[in-house]
Regions:
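Interdomain helical linkers/hinges and coiled-coil/dimerization scaffolds
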Residues: 97, 101-149
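Receiver (REC) domain active-site loop signature in two-component systems and cognate sites
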Residues: 59
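Two-component/phosphorelay signaling modules centered on CheY-like receiver
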Residues: 12-33
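Active-site residues of response regulator receiver
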Residues: 9, 56
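A short, hydrophobic beta-strand element within the central beta-sheet of small alpha/beta folds
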Residues: 78-87
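Acidic catalytic/metal-coordinating carboxylates
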Residues: 37-40, 63-66, 85
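Acidic, metal-coordinating helix/loop segments flanking the phosphotransfer/catalytic sites
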Residues: 34-52
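Short amphipathic alpha-helix used as the core "switch/output" element in two-component signaling
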Residues: 43, 65-76
């Protein structure tokens, strides 16, 4: 299982820095998209599926929190979402958590916090995938039984 990751930040050096501290392939991840702001990320998400979004909180055009709220409200993506922030203000973290943010990571982002996030997402995704497989199996059994009777 490979985790499809999108990185969203208006600072190119941050995007580059996020892709360097770990070997994404080794942790079974693939960076499928980098976006310079929430609006660009939103447009990508309307047409493409990702498993994890790491987004800066403060960006022009659309902030990370606005992106998170919009994709949840419009049911565009159920990807796991982590906010990257230079602010340790509780109100930002509270708003992010209210919108189903899986993690609120303070900048500068450490290698350890990225690896911990990836492990967390991998475990959650495995459980979700298993639940989905069980649901589909039960659906098939139900259909077969009803067709046979």
């Amino acid at each position: 299982m490979k985790i499809r990751v999108m990185l969203v930040d208006d600072e190119p050096f941050i995007l580059q820095g996020l892709s360097m501290p770990i070997d994404w392939e080794k942790v079974h991840c693939e960076i499928v998209k980098t976006a310079a702001n929430g609006k660009e990320a939103y447009e990508y998400l309307k047409e493409n599926r990702v498993d994890l979004i790491l987004a800066d909180i403060e960006m022009p055009e659309m902030t990370g929190l606005e992106l998170l709220e919009k994709i949840r409200e419009e049911k565009i993506s159920d990807a796991y979402f982590a906010i990257l922030s230079g602010y340790n203000d509780f109100s930002y973290a509270q708003r992010a958590i209210h919108s189903s943010c899986i993690e609120y990571i303070l900048k500068p982002v450490s290698r350890d916090s990225l690896i911990a996030l990836i492990r967390k997402v991998t475990k959650k995704k495995e459980l979700t995938d298993q639940e989905e497989q069980k649901r589909k199996k039960l659906q098939r059994i139900y259909l077969i039984r009803n067709l046979a009777s």
